[in-house]
């Protein structure tokens, strides 16, 4: 299979995986290690055609079990006047032409999953600014992997996955970056997939894409 196909398929592995990570109630506790799940999933989808990729991803989501939905709760939040104008665009989950009907249906249903129990990978903390307390995401559930100074292909892409999705869902200024954040993901999948590339150099380069000075 071509490198272009592998990068394209890996992109959907990352965007679908990120959506599942922050929306599926299965990640309210430590029953599942999503990093392990993703690294195991990657070779199954990396060289597959779109239809097979979509089927594998849909079955992967099913593997996390049943859950309750609370559509009214989240619709009320999304229609509130206090909702940030530049919130994450998740319209792509309804793209049946790209994702196929079954995968799209699973992602759309996850949007309304009851997440009352929270998420093990991100919590909300507060910091004081201008005499008021403002919410801030805290990613204290993420594993640091201090011993992986030169990780293999799977964990290199996991780095891209984790950072890109953190920014996608929790960094309100991503729309101000010089480069469209949607373009950053495929670029760094390609960069990290290159065996001759420096892992630390590419990681620093990716972080610098935030232009957060």
Regions found by a protein language model. Give the residues of each.
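Flexible, low-complexity junctional segments that flank or bridge functional domains
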Residues: 1-213
């Amino acid at each position: 299979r071509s490198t272009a196909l592998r990068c394209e398929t890996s992109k959907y592995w990352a965007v679908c995986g990120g959506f599942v990570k922050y929306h599926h109630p299965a990640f309210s506790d430590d029953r599942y290690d999503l990093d392990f799940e993703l690294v195991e999933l990657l070779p199954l989808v990396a060289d597959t055609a779109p239809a097979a990729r979509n089927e594998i991803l849909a079955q992967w989501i099913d593997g996390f079990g049943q859950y309750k939905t609370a559509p009214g709760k989240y619709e009320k939040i999304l229609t509130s006047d206090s909702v940030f104008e530049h919130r994450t665009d998740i319209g792509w989950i309804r793209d049946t032409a790209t994702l196929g009907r079954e995968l799209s249906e699973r992602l759309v249903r996850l949007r309304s999953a009851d997440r009352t129990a929270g998420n093990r990978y991100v919590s909300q903390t507060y910091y004081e600014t201008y005499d008021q307390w403002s919410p801030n995401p805290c990613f204290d559930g993420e594993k640091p992997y201090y011993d992986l100074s030169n990780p293999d292909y799977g964990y290199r892409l996991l780095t891209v996955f984790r950072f890109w999705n953190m920014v996608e869902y929790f960094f309100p200024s991503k729309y101000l970056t010089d480069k469209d954040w949607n373009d950053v993901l495929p670029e760094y999948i390609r960069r990290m997939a290159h065996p001759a590339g420096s892992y630390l150099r590419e990681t620093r380069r990716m972080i610098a894409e935030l232009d957060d000075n």
